[in-house]
Structure formats: structure tokens, C-alpha cells
UniProtKB/Swiss-Prot annotation:
Protein name stated in the entry: Probable protein kinase UbiB
Record's function text: Is probably a protein kinase regulator of UbiI activity which is involved in aerobic coenzyme Q (ubiquinone) biosynthesis.
HAMAP family: UbiB
Superkingdom per UniProt: Bacteria
Pathway(s) it belongs to: Cofactor biosynthesis; ubiquinone biosynthesis [regulation]
Species of the source: Tolumonas auensis (strain DSM 9187 / NBRC 110442 / TA 4)
Main location class: membrane
Membrane protein topology class: Multi-pass membrane protein
Length: 543
């Protein structure tokens, strides 16, 4: 690492330690070299012992800047990984950053589109309409048709900042994974998922494609409106779309003043969500209040407006089927069915004891269902399910995590608009109708017709496919032997690395103690400790 990265690495470590976040790792999970090294950093003590661990984690991420703020926001949706108190605190993170100079935005747009602003747009406002950590938004008009538009532009020089922080986060994740084997949090995988999410946000062509798809799915719909994307003007760092005017969905007073039917609006939000999931298999996965507006027009026939389609979710047919059956089984209190569906779908390991899983579900969910249905939080049911399934080693399902987050948003918005909203009564007819379409002779015949061309094409090739499969099995047996040898080599390297890290920490502590009386000996010890640490880290990072 270069000097700049070492400084940033120290800053990250010192902020985390000053907020006492080393306490998040149980002492019995900390190898003795780590405990020894932590004691040597005696000047970095927890300065906020009176705060909860969730508050300390949130404040630490806020202090580390936009990359860590967005990481915390992503972690807040991973209820399958984090304890509830941490997830709820991280959900409070706000993506508030100062805007950058409008002249820089102008130059960025001109560079991306290859023409001066004046040749394409009129009334370009250099004062941003909105600003976030990755991009900011300016208003203008299209010269070709005088349409009002917004231009979203990526922050200049944001990519090197993101790459540096992600590289350091990946290094920290590798160290955590090495020091705490079999960690359910899977830190390296989490950082990799975050990297992909950030890269998607940096490519505005991806957001444009998502918005176009969502708009097509709800074309001529009275329930949801998605602004028009001007794709000819879109580039990787620039997105141009129709400017919309609406009432923020969180501004209930303004909605009431406009005469909006809040009950119908809340119910339509639920219908829009389930339509996206079960009809289209493609849903807007970032419907927090800042991304949702309500049309001023036709307040007695209200229409939602969705913006910022940077994050979307998709579900395959099998996931939709299991999800719908799970929802119906939940509210019929058929916990056995829920447990069996989780095993059949592969969401929990196949050796899970269904009886134990059923009993755990009943213990957690039965008190919830003792309430009237109108008072039950659909999202809370999913949260309790995830927390229970986590104890049974539920495999992470990114699409379900996004769906659960979106459902929490929709339910929260719906109950804010109309506190008596019975989400189950609104959703149940939709789910039952969808299930009827998926089960029965008509559904079976439809599936056969869909698959018939595929099997007709593959049938003549079946002998060759069987032979190729048997050959691959034999080849994979040889690969397994090779992987077994690699595992033993890696295990040996990790054992050596543990020794080097422990020796380095011990020498460092000894050098600090010897420094006042034996400066030369302390310098030698410090040099050797650095060599040990570098060698140990090198062994950790080797594949």
C-alpha cells in the first residue's frame, strides 16, 4: 500500500477503536495476538461508553465519509446478518454531503455528451436541485422540444475515492475472515456485494435501463408513474429524464390539503408492490420516502410517482412460488408448511430438522398472530422469520433481502398515510389469484407448451449430453483431489501467518516498553515486528 492508503487505513482503524467497535467481536473469538495488539494501542480507547453499540457504529460510519455511510445503509438491509439493534440504528444513516461546484457539473456533462451545454439544453441551472454522495441533480430544458428535465451527474473524481476505500475494506474483511474462521457474517462476500452495488450506482446507463423497464411495465397505469428517460442523452456518468412535480409521499399535511384519498393511495402502494413482484418479477428496490411522490392530479384517483431506479430486484418463477406459498402459510399459521418450504427451496440447508425449525417459528410468530390482522406488520413477520432462519444457517438470498427491505418501506409509507391499513387484506386476494394461475391443469399445460420447443431441440442430442456429463463427473473427481491438496497448503500458510502476526505483535509491544532505556534494541525489535507483520499479511492475502 502507498503512504496515502496507510494513512487512510490508520484513520479507519482509529475511528473504529475510538468508538469501541472492537467490542463487537466477542473476546473468545479474538486470538491472543489480536488481544495483545489491541492492548498496545492503549491511546485509542472507547470515548463513547455511554452510547449503545448501534449508535457508536452509526457515528463511526458517519465520521468515515460517504463510502462508509452507503455501506452502513446497505448493511441495515441485511437483517439476515446483523442483530436487530445494529440494523435499526444503521437504517438511520443519512446520505448528506455538500454539493460540488455547478461549473464542474457543467464540464462533466459536456465531456460525457461531447457538446457544449448550450447546444443541447436551455435554462441549465448550475445550482443543484439535490445532492448525494455519488451524484447530484440539476434542472434544465431540452432544446429539441422545450421539455423540462433533470440531469443527474456523477461526482467528479469519486471513483478513486471509492476504489481506495473498497480496497482497504476488502483487506480488513480478509483479516477478519482469517482471524475468525467460519464467520457467519462472511465479511469478504459482504464487501464484494457492496462493491458491485456501488459500481452499479456509478453506471447511470444501468439506472436508465431500469427506469425504462419499470415505465414499460406500468405504461398507461393509473397506479404508478415512472418519468420518461431521454436515452439519447444518457451516458455512464450522465442521466437525463423528465422532471416531475408531485407531493412528497411523507408530507401527509400537503396530501390532505390537496384532497388526496389517503386510504386508496395506501392500498395502491401495496398493489403496486405485489404487481411488480408477482406479475413482472422486476421491482423497484429503493422506495424510501425520498424516492416516492404523489401526483397533484386526480386526488380522488391518486397515482404514485417513483424515481431513482438505481437499485432493482428480480425473482425467478420458483422464488415467486415459494414466496407466495410462504405468505399464505404464515397467515394460516401453518408453520410446518413454512419450515418445509424453506428446506425445499434451498433457503436453509437440506439437513435442517423440520420439526425444530417449525417449533422455533411457532415460538416467535404465534405471539404476533395473537393480534388482530390489521395490527400485524407484514415486514415485521419477515424480519422475525429471517432472524429465526438465521439460527438454522439460512443461506443469504440477495433478492429476498431486497424484497424484505422494499416491503418494509411500502408498509411504513402505507401506515403513515392510513394507519388502519390492513396490508394482509389488500395482499391476500392478489396472492390467491396468482397462486390459482400457477396451479392446476391450465398452468401445467401452459408450462408444457413453454418447454416443448426446448425439449424438441434437445432430444436428438441426449446421448451426447449423457456422455459429456459422465466425462465431466470423472474430471471433477480429479479436481476435488487437487482442491483438497490446495486446502492443506492454505491451512499451513494460515498457521504460519498466525505465528508471524503474533510474533510481530509481541515484538511491537516489547519494543514500546524498551524504547526509553534501550533505543537501539527497540528499533531492531520494531523493524523485525514490521517484517513479521508484512510477511503475515502477505500470507493472508495470497490465494
Amino acid at each position: 500500500m502507498i503512504l496515502r492508503e496507510w494513512r487512510r487505513f490508520y484513520t479507519i482503524g482509529s475511528v473504529l477503536l475510538r468508538h469501541g467497535l472492537d467490542e463487537l467481536i466477542p473476546r473468545h473469538w479474538q486470538p491472543w495476538p489480536v488481544r495483545l495488539f489491541r492492548r498496545s494501542l492503549f491511546w485509542l480507547r472507547n470515548r463513547y461508553p455511554e452510547q449503545s453499540r448501534g449508535a457508536r457504529l452509526r457515528h463511526a460510519f458517519e465520521g468515515l465519509g460517504p463510502v462508509f455511510i452507503k455501506f452502513g445503509q446497505m448493511l441495515s438491509t441485511r437483517r439476515d446478518l446483523l442483530p436487530p439493534d445494529l440494523a435499526e440504528e444503521l437504517a438511520m444513516l443519512q446520505d448528506r454531503v455538500p454539493s460540488f461546484d455547478g461549473q464542474l457539473a457543467r464540464e462533466q456533462i459536456e465531456q460525457a455528451l461531447g457538446q457544449p451545454i448550450e447546444a443541447l439544453f436551455a435554462d441549465f441551472d448550475q445550482q443543484p436541485l439535490a445532492s448525494a454522495s455519488v451524484a447530484q441533480v440539476h434542472t434544465a430544458r431540452l432544446k429539441e422540444n422545450n421539455a423540462e428535465i433533470v440531469i443527474k451527474v456523477i461526482r467528479p473524481d469519486i471513483k478513486p475515492v471509492i476504489n481506495d476505500d473498497i480496497r482497504l475494506m476488502r483487506l480488513c474483511a480478509k483479516i477478519v475472515a482469517f482471524l475468525i474462521p467460519n464467520n457467519r457474517l462472511r465479511p469478504v462476500e459482504v464487501i464484494e456485494e457492496y462493491r458491485r452495488t456501488l459500481l452499479d450506482e456509478l453506471n447511470l446507463m444501468s439506472e436508465a435501463a431500469n427506469a425504462i423497464q419499470l415505465r414499460r411495465n406500468f405504461e398507461n397505469s393509473s397506479h404508478l408513474y415512472v418519468p420518461l428517460v431521454y436515452s439519447d442523452y444518457c451516458r455512464e456518468s450522465v442521466l437525463v429524464m423528465e422532471r416531475i412535480y408531485g407531493i412528497p409521499v411523507s408530507d401527509r399535511a400537503a396530501l390532505e390539503a390537496n384532497g388526496t384519498d389517503l386510504k386508496l393511495l395506501a392500498e395502491r402502494g401495496v398493489e403496486v408492490f405485489f404487481t411488480q413482484v408477482f406479475r413482472d418479477s422486476f421491482f423497484h428496490a429503493d422506495m424510501h420516502p425520498g424516492n416516492v411522490f404523489v401526483s397533484y392530479e386526480h386526488p380522488h384517483d391518486p397515482q404514485w410517482i417513483g424515481i431513482d431506479c438505481g437499485i432493482v430486484g428480480t425473482l425467478n418463477r420458483q422464488d415467486k412460488r415459494y414466496l407466495a406459498e410462504n405468505f399464505l402459510a404464515f397467515f394460516n399459521r401453518d408453520y410446518r408448511k413454512v419450515a418445509e418450504l424453506h428446506v425445499q427451496s434451498g433457503w436453509v440447508p437440506p439437513d435442517t430438522k423440520v420439526e425444530e425449525f417449525e417449533s422455533a417459528l411457532r415460538t416467535v410468530l404465534e405471539p404476533i398472530f395473537a393480534k388482530p390482522l390489521a395490527e400485524i406488520s407484514f415486514g415485521q413477520v419477515l424480519l422475525n422469520l429471517f432472524n429465526t432462519a438465521r439460527r438454522f444457517n439460512m443461506h443469504v438470498q440477495p433478492q429476498l433481502v431486497l424484497l424484505q427491505k422494499t416491503l418494509l418501506y411500502i408498509e411504513g409509507l402505507g401506515r403513515h398515510l392510513y394507519p388502519q391499513l390492513d396490508l394482509w387484506q389488500t395482499a391476500k386476494p392478489f396472492l390467491e389469484h396468482w397462486m390459482r394461475q400457477q396451479i392446476g391443469p391450465k398452468a401445467a399445460w401452459r408450462a408444457i407448451k413453454e418447454k416443448a420447443p426446448f425439449w424438441a431441440e434437445k432430444l436428438p442430442d441426449m446421448p451426447d449430453l449423457i456422455y459429456d456429463t459422465l466425462t465431466q463427473v470423472q474430471h471433477q473427481q480429479h479436481m476435488v483431489k487437487g482442491l483438497y491438496q490446495q486446502y492443506h497448503q492454505q491451512h499451513r500458510r494460515h498457521a504460519q501467518a498466525r505465528f508471524l502476526l503474533g510474533a510481530g505483535a509481541t515484538l511491537l509491544l516489547g519494543s514500546i516498553l524498551l524504547l526509553p532505556t534501550h533505543e537501539q534494541l527497540a528499533s531492531a525489535g520494531l523493524t523485525i515486528s514490521i517484517i513479521c507483520w508484512l510477511n503475515g499479511w502477505w500470507k493472508i492475502s495470497r490465494r
